Structures are given as structure tokens and as C-alpha cells.
Amino acid sequence: MMVMDLSLQRRLAASVLKCGENRVWFDPAALEDIATAATKQDIRELIEQGVIKRKPVNGVSRARINKRKLQKRKGRRRGHGSRKGAKGARMPRKRMWILRIRALRKALRQMKAEGVVDRRTYRILYRKAKGGEFRSVAHLKIYVEQMKR
């Protein structure tokens, strides 16, 4: 079998099918018939016969992305090797402060309601929390325990 140059036919078929040349499919069994086609009309006839067809558009699979998203939802892919931004870029210092101070104030209110601390102590601890003295709620509770001794 000799190799035929079907670039003209491919170009004409692409024009008729209104697609790119890469999406034009030729039936391997009818390459001789295709080689004889020289006009767009010849190409149209071959398309009607089903010898020339337009291939479907190739999509890009989202399987890998979906799998990665599922892993992230499970809390994976968060180790040191996966981090790009600085610590402050991933969770801004202000946002961390807001979360911490809200938790501390909630814990303080609860302690006051339960009678663990009186009004005066509550106010002192509230100000200390505002000043950034406590790292966490656990740190605050340790401080209160030591204060009682």
C-alpha cells in the first residue's frame, strides 16, 4: 500500500464540515475514493456516503481535579510540602486574632455565668485577653486555676 497525500481533501472536508483539519476522519477502507475527490462537491458526496466524518470535540477530563477536591474535603494535602503561601497569607494574623479573642470572650462569659470568676476578676481577665496575654482558651483556664491557688 502506498502512502497518499490527502492534505487537499482534508482541507476541503474541514471547510465543508466547518471544523478543524484534525477533526476530519477518513474511512481507512475508502482512501482510494477519497484520493480521487478534487472538489468540495466530491467531498460532500463522500460525506453523504459516510466515508468522511467529523470527529467529536475532545474534552479535558476533570477526574483528576475531582479526586484532588475529594481529598482536600477530607483534610488531606495540607502538609508542609503542599503549602505555597506564607503562614500569614494562608490565614491572616487578624483573622486568627478574631477567632482567638471570640473564643476567649465566650469562655470568659461562660465562666462568669457559672460563677467560676466574679465580676471584678472577669473584667481583669477580659482586659488581659484583649492585651493578648492568653494564647488559647486552654491557656486562659490554666491561668484561672493558678489564680485560685
Swiss-Prot record:
SMART domains linked to this entry: Ribosomal_L19e (SM01416)
GO process annotations (BP): translation
Pfam family, one: Ribosomal_L19e
GO molecular function annotation: large ribosomal subunit rRNA binding; structural constituent of ribosome
InterPro entries the UniProt entry points to: 60S_ribosomal_eL19_sf, Ribosomal_eL19, Ribosomal_eL19_CS, Ribosomal_eL19_dom, Ribosomal_eL19_dom1
Entry keyword Transferase: no
CDD domains: Ribosomal_L19e
Ranges where the record places region Disordered: 67-90
Keywords associated with the record: Ribonucleoprotein, Ribosomal protein, RNA-binding, rRNA-binding
One term under GO cellular component: cytosolic large ribosomal subunit
PANTHER family: 60S RIBOSOMAL PROTEIN L19
Protein role: Binds to the 23S rRNA.
Quaternary structure and interacting proteins, as annotated: Part of the 50S ribosomal subunit.
Protein family: Belongs to the eukaryotic ribosomal protein eL19 family.
Protein name, entry field: Large ribosomal subunit protein eL19
Organism the protein comes from: Archaeoglobus fulgidus (strain ATCC 49558 / DSM 4304 / JCM 9628 / NBRC 100126 / VC-16)
